[in-house]
Amino acid sequence: MKILMPYFKRYRLDVWIAMLSVIVLVFATLWQPRLLQVIMEAIIKNDQAMVFREGLMLLGLAVLGIIGGIVNTIYAARVALGVATDLRADLYAKVQSLAYADVEKFSPSNLVVRMTNDINQVQQIVMAGFQQITRIPLLFIGALILAVMTMPEQWWVIVVMMAVILGVALIAVRRMTKYFAQTQQDIENVNTVARENLMGIRVVKSFVQEPNEIKKFSAASDELTAVTAKIGYWFAILMPAFFLTANVAVGVAVYLVGQTITTHPAYLASITSFISYLMQILFAVINGGFLMTFASRAVISLGRIGEVMTTEPSMTYVDGDAAPVAGDIHFDHVTFTYPGDAQPTLKDVTFTVKAGSMLGIVGATGSGKTTLAQLIARLYDPDSGTVSIGGIDVRALPEKALRSTVAYVLQRSTLFSGTIAGNLRQVKPDAQPSHMQWAANIAQSAEFIERLPQTYDAPVEERSQNFSGGQKQRLAITRGVIANPEILILDDATSALDARSEKLVQEALDRELKSTTTVVIAEKIASIIRADQILVLDNGRISGQGTHHELLQDSAIYRAIYQTQKAREEGLHE
C-alpha cells in the first residue's frame, strides 16, 4: 500500500470528506436500533407522545444516514478514479522511461494487462476501502458494545457467531489468494494469444489456421474460466455460510429470550434491537471478509504494478545538450549477448564508417545484422567494447542528442493511428508542409500522399491498415529523413518496394542527404552495391569487409550470396 500513499495525498480533501461522511453514516446506523427499542418500550407503555417524538428522531437519523452514504460514495469514487488515473499515467510514463530490453523482459502484452486490468483492481479496492475501511471497524465495535449493553446475558452468542464466520472467511481468503494470482497470469495468456492472432491474421487466413487458432484461444480461455470458477465456488459457499450462522445466532437469541420473557418483560423491546445489532455485526464481518478477499487480489495487482514502477532502467543517459553529433561510426571489439541467451550474437566486431558515407550490411538470417544496427541506435548496450558516434561513446551521449543524430527505419514499419502529419511530427514537431513534402519526395511517398483527399492530414488507421506494405515503408522512410539526421539506418526498410521505387529512393537519398551517414541492412545485394563499404556478417563475426568489387574477389560468402541472387534474377528473366 506504500505505493498508493503519494496518490492519496493528492486527494486529501476528498479522502477526509469520504471518511467523515462514513462516520456520520455509522453513527446513524448504530443509533437507529436504540431508538427503535425506545419506541417499542413506549408502545408497550402506550405512550403515544414518546412514540411520535422518537419516531421523528428515527426518521431524521435515517435521512442523515442516507446523506452520509451518498456523500461517502461520491467522494470515495472521486478518490478511486483520481488515484487510478494518476497511477495509470505514472505507470505508462515509467514504461516509456524503460530501456528497450526492459520492455522486452516484461513483454508488451504483460505491460498492457498491468496498465489496464491491474489498475482496475486497484481502483476497485480503493473505492471499496474508502466506503468500508472506516465503516467496518466502527460499525463492528459500536454494534458489539451496544448489543452487549442491550442484552448482556447473550454475549456468548455473539462470540460464537463471530468465531464461526471469521474461521470460514480466513480459510476462504487463504484458498482464494492463490487463485487470484493465477487469474492475472491467465488473463495475460488470453491477451497474448488474442494479440498474436490478430497481429498475424493474414498468416492465419493464408494457411487456413483458423481452427488451430480457435483451439489455442479456447485452451487459454478455458484455463481462465476454470480458475475463475473456483473463485466463484468459494464465493458461493461464503454467503450462505455467513447467513446460516447469523440466522442460527438470531434463533438461539430469540429462544433464550423467550425462556426468560415472563421474568424480564423489558426483553420484549430489547430483542428487536439486539437482533439489529447482531445483523450489523454480521454485516461488518461479512464485508470485512469480502474486503480482505478483494484486498488480496488488489495486493497482487499492486505488487505487479510496483514491480514495474520500481524497476530501474537498465540503460541510463547523461544530461547534456540535445544537439546532434557528427555521423562517423566506430565499433571497437564489440561483443553482445541478448538477455537470457547463452551465446553472444555479435563477437568481437570492429569497423569504422566515415561521416557522409554509405555502409551496407549483408549476411544470413541470424548473423547479427539487426543487432548491430540496434547497438548504433543504442537500443542495447554491448557486453564489452565500445560503440562510438562522432568520436563519442554512445553511452556518454545525452538521449536527445543521440535521437537527433540517429534515425532508425525498420523493415516492419510501425505507424501510429492519427494522421500522416502527426506521424511525421513525432520526429520533427515543428515540421511544416514544405518539410513534409521534401521528405516525402525523397521516400517516393509524395505520389500517393498527394492523391489522398486530405493529403498530409489523411488519417492513419489502427495498425495503418489503410496503407499497403510498400506505402507503409515509404511513410516510415519519410518519417526517418524529415529531420535530416546525421545517421540514417535502413533495416531492410525497402524490402516491400518494387525495384523502380527502391532505385528512386536510393538516388534521392544520395542527392538530398549527401552529408548523412547511411547504414543499409539488406537481403538483396543490389540494394547495397553502391555502398562505400560493405560488411559481411557470419554467425556474429565480420567475415568480409570492403566494396562490392573487393568482396567479390576476397569473400567467398559474399560471392556465393551474389551469385545465388544473380542466378535467381536471370532465371526470372528467361
Regions found by a protein language model. Name each.
Residues 1-10, 111:
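A short amphipathic helical element positioned immediately N-terminal to and/or at the very start
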Residues 9, 15-71, 75, 148-153, ...:
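Transmembrane helix-loop-helix hairpins at lipid-water interfaces of multipass membrane proteins
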Residues 12, 97-101, 117-126, 130, ...:
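An intracellular "coupling" helix at the cytosolic face of ABC transporter transmembrane type-1 domains
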Residues 24-28, 32, 59, 63-80, ...:
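Hydrophobic alpha-helical membrane-associated segments
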Residues 28, 32, 48-50, 56, ...:
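Hydrophobic alpha-helical transmembrane segments of ABC transporter permease domains
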Residues 45, 81, 89-113, 117-119, ...:
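Short intracellular "coupling" helices and adjacent cytoplasmic loop segments at the cytosolic face
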Residues 47, 146-160, 230-304, 308-309:
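Helix-loop-helix
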Residues 324-574:
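ABC-type nucleotide-binding domain
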